Amino acid sequence: MSGHELNDVDFISSTHEAELIITWFQKHGINDLLLICGASLGAHVAAEILQKQRTFAQYAMIESLKAYQYKGIILKLFSYIGNKVIKKCASTKGYMDGTYNQKYASDDAKCTINNMNKKTLENIMIESGNYQIKQQKTKIFAETMILYGSKEKKECKSNTEILQKQIEKCTIVEIPKYRHGELAIGNPYKHLEYLKKLISQGSI
């Protein structure tokens, strides 16, 4: 994703990211995908892709479609303070260790955050603070599983319900005692189990 690696490309928004991905696949003549997945910010991007290209993939797995729905000055403060806090957390020795049960996951998260520039982090915080799934009547054909942890249910509820209404066949999964993004980042084997069930059975 733009802004997440050692390059000069900033993350702008999930909408912009979705357009880049769709364009890349069109340019390379790839139009028959089995699966699209996204967690956290990636969930926003995956949702945008499905809304723009309703036949983009046969299956979709979306985790932690979260937003706080902040507006105006509150959103600006959230972006400004959040930018500084997340950088501080990533640079403080031991602070994020074990956040996702796996040390490699914490190390990878810290490395990624420390490599982000100010503009990318600001845009990510704004996206996280006010992202809202677009209302539309066009149906999405990908058989979809939307997951979230019970500890983030309140923040995920609105976007999940809006997107669910736009999908022909959709399963909602609430994972007990899980936090934001904990499935994909901290428990990859369990994440893979959900993927296998979605593809092999069509639902769980």
Segment roles from a protein language model:
Residues 37-46:
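Gly/Ala-rich beta-loop-alpha elbow adjacent to hydrolase catalytic centers
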Residues 1-34:
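Active-site loop/oxyanion-hole signature of alpha/beta-hydrolase fold enzymes
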Residues 164-181:
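Catalytic histidine neighborhood in serine/cysteine hydrolases
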Residues 72-73, 87-138:
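Conserved alpha/beta-hydrolase catalytic His-Asp/Glu region
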Residues 7, 178-190:
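Catalytic histidine-centered segment of alpha/beta-hydrolase-like enzymes
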Residues 51-86:
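Flexible "cap/lid" loop of the alpha/beta hydrolase fold
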